[in-house]
């Protein structure tokens, strides 16, 4: 579909140089055009995620061939389609996982990485779904194989990932434990359905999860911390437990007792999302559409929105994320 009906340039947020939030600056760039299998979305809201912060600092460069504009999830309206796109039409509302480019007025997405906008959600809520729901579904339920009746521990329960993981695991009948850094954050996690919320600053999550499981330990652990949490996760895990690593905010290296892993027959795996193939991410999208979107439609799961900022205040949104006080997702609006 031609894009002659659209502007030739767009507003976006560029990273002037690696650094703090202040390096995020408004800029004009040429309008992208959808290639085969792609859709062009007029962005109405874009989620802010921890990888965006790492990219801004120069620690997480975009994969080859993707936009250098930050932003990994969007919601908006399809305004143009590339060749061989069959699912989406101009004017339809979608939310989409993108490899980059979300902090902009217009953004390209692969056809298979877009999902229909649930009627129960606003654009702001929809923009908070793709990165977190794709990450949680794939890592907790596909890699971690969390099953009904099992126990689940997610660190950082008040984050976008954490608030999503608590709700999805609870909706699918797991017993949910989480860690958070303040009494207020722990209370928010309990309100979302966590059976046990542990203040990691004042309490020992290993001891408390052992007590809650009568010494058995936790079946599945989703960890974004790394560092010394790795060894402590091995202590907290049940025999045949599964630990899934999706980040390492403390450290990527750890000195751990491998004998504990062997004796408990633990599985410690991990993954990233951004660099996965188009086909892989399309498969995850279909799984989210099949299993998670009905839970949203039924009101059992809902994105938690901490705050919103207009696009030109992306630097303030990043400062909010880095101050550590947020509960749920931070979203940019256009």
Task: Pin down the residues of each PLM region.
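C-terminal capping/lid region of NAD(P)-dependent oxidoreductase domains
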Residues: 2-10, 293, 298-307, 315-334
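Phosphate-coordination loops involved in phosphoryl transfer and adenosine-cofactor binding
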Residues: 9, 148-150, 218, 240
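Glycine-rich beta-strand-centered segment in the early N-terminal region that forms part
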Residues: 30-48, 59-101
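NAD(P)H dinucleotide-binding glycine-rich loop of Rossmann-like/cofactor-binding domains
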Residues: 54, 69, 87, 93-158, ...
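Short glycine-centered segments of the SAM/dcSAM-binding site in methyltransferase folds
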Residues: 93, 151, 175, 242, ...
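Adenosine-nucleotide cofactor-binding segment
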Residues: 154, 170-232, 284
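N-terminal Rossmann-fold NAD(P) dinucleotide-binding loop
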Residues: 162-163
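Glycine-rich phosphate-binding loop and adjacent beta-alpha segment
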Residues: 180-183, 225-301, 326, 334
């Amino acid at each position: 579909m031609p894009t002659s009906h659209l502007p030739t340039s767009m507003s976006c947020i560029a990273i002037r140089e690696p650094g703090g939030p202040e390096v995020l600056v408004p800029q004009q760039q040429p309008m992208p055009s959808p290639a085969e299998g792609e859709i062009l979305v007029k962005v109405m809201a874009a989620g802010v995620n921890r990888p965006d912060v790492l990219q801004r600092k120069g620690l997480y460069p975009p994969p080859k061939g993707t936009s250098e504009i930050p932003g990994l999830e969007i919601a908006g309206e399809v305004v143009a389609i590339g060749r061989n796109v069959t699912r989406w039409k101009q004017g339809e509302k979608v939310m989409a996982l993108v490899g980059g480019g979300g902090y902009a007025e217009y953004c390209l997405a692969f056809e298979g990485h877009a999902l229909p906008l649930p009627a129960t959600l606003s654009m702001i809520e929809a923009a908070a779904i793709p990165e977190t729901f794709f990450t949680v579904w794939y890592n907790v339920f596909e890699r971690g194989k969390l099953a009904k009746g099992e126990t689940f521990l997610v660190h950082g329960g008040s984050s976008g990932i954490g608030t999503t993981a608590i709700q999805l695991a609870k909706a699918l009948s797991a017993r949910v434990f989480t860690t958070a850094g303040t009494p207020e954050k722990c209370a928010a996690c309990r309100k979302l359905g966590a059976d046990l919320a542990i203040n990691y600053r004042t309490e020992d999550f290993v001891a408390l999860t052992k007590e809650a499981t009568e010494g058995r330990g936790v079946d599945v652990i989703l960890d974004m911390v790394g560092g010394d949490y790795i060894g402590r996760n091995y202590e907290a895990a049940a025999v045949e437990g599964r630990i899934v690593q999706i980040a390492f905010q403390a450290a990527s290296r750890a000195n751990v007792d491998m004998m504990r892993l062997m004796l408990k027959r633990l599985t410690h795996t991990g993954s990233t999302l951004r660099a996965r193939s188009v086909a892989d991410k399309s498969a995850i999208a279909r799984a989210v559409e099949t299993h998670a979107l009905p839970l949203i439609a039924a009101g059992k799961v809902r994105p938690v929105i901490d705050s919103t900022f207009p696009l030109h205040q992306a630097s303030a949104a990043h400062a909010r994320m880095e101050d550590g006080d947020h509960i749920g997702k931070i979203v940019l609006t256009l």
